[in-house]
Amino acid sequence: GKDAATHTSGFRAALSTPEIKARIRARSTSFATRMTRHIAHQAPINPGDTVMLVDLGYNGSVQNSVNRMLGSWTGGHVAGRYLILRENDVSALDKRGFIDTRHYDDRALVMLCRSVSILEQLSTERTGSVVDYREDGQPMRKKHTGRTEHDDVRTVARTGAIAFAAESGCAFYRPPALNDDDGRRLSAVGALARLLLLPNAQELALFAGLKHDVNLGTSDTNQLVDEDGAREGLRCGGVGAALSSERLFPAAELQAIDPALNLALLSMARHGIDVRPIDLQTDGLDVPVILADAHEQTTVTLTAWPTHGGFYRLIVPIGISRFTAGIMLGKVAPYAEVAQTTVQAVDDMTRTWADTIQNQVPGAPIFEGMRVLNGALFECAPDSMIVVPPPSARSGAQAVSIVFRPIGVVDAAVVRLAA
C-alpha cells in the first residue's frame, strides 16, 4: 500500500547516501575475505586454478553473486555444476546441469523443480546452516533445529541411495543398449520424475513428517506434505487451490487424495496447456439467494460451482457491506454439509488462491430452519436458509463465500420455479 511504498522509497534513499555505501562496501569486502579463507581451508587453490561450485541447483543464485569475486581472487575460471539447472534469467556464466535445457525443454524442468524441495530435505546435514565466517575462515553455524525423526528419514534414504549406486551394475545380465551418458541420464530423469510427480504410498509415508526449512534468515519451517491442508484447499477452492504456487510438494498431496486429478494437472503442465480454473467450471448448481438491506429485498439465482469431493462453492456479492444474504439451501437439497462460510473482498477473488484466502474472514452464519444432524451436517426444510449478515468496517465490494455439499439434490427445474 501507500505506507509500504513510502518506506521502500525512504530505504532506497538511505542506501544511496555516501556513508551507507561506504559501510556496505567495507562489510562486503570483509565478508568476501573471510569466505575466501574458508574456501582455502577446504582445498589448496593456486593462482589461475578453476573453482567449481557444485550444488543441487536450480538457478545457481550463489554463483551469480560470487562469480566475479572468486574469479578476481584466484585469477582463474569459475564454473558451476548442478543436478538440475533452470536459470530464471540467462546469466552467461559457466553453468551446466546433469539435467538442463540441453536435454529437456523449460516446461519439463519447471515440472521437476516444482516439487524438488524433497531433494533439498534429503540432502541437508545435521549441522546448522552457515550464517557467517570467522576471521580465520571457520564457518559460524546457527543451531541445528531439525527433529531426530527427520534425521532418521534422511539416513534411511541416503543409505539406500549409496547402496544402490554401489550395486547398480549387479542387476544387469548384460549392459543395456543405451549404457552411455544420455542413456543413464534418461533413466535417472525417469526415476526422479516418478518420485517427484507420482510418489507411491511408501514414499508418501516417508515424506509425511518432513518439514521444509524456509531459510531467508529465519528459523521458520513449513510442512512439506500437508495432505489435510491440500484436501481443505480442494474442497474450498477446487482446481484453483491445487494449482497454487504456495504448496511445496503438490504432486505428493494430490497423489494421495486424487491420483486422476494429479495426472491430469501434470499432463497440462507438461504440454503447456493454459487451463484456468474457470475453464473447468461445469455442472453448476443453481441456488436461490435473497439479498436484503434496510429498505428492500430481492431474490436472485446464482450458480454454485463444483470444487472437489462433492462440494460446491457459491459466491454471493453483497456490495460494500450492504446486503444480508439468505442462501436458500432448502430449495436445493433436503440435506447439506456446510464446510465453510467466509467474507472477502471481491478484488481478492481475481488473484491467486493464496491471495484469496489470505484476507478472508469467517462469516457469521445463522442457520434458519436447519436442524443439526452431526457436526456440519444439516437437515433442511423447503424454506431453510443460511443467513449471513454483512460484515462491518470493511472497505470495497465484498462477497460471501459458502462451501457446501448437497445431499439428495432437488431437480433443477424445481429450484428455478422456487426462485
Where do the protein language model's features map onto the residues?
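Long, low-complexity, Lys/Arg-enriched
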Residues: 1-288, 406-418
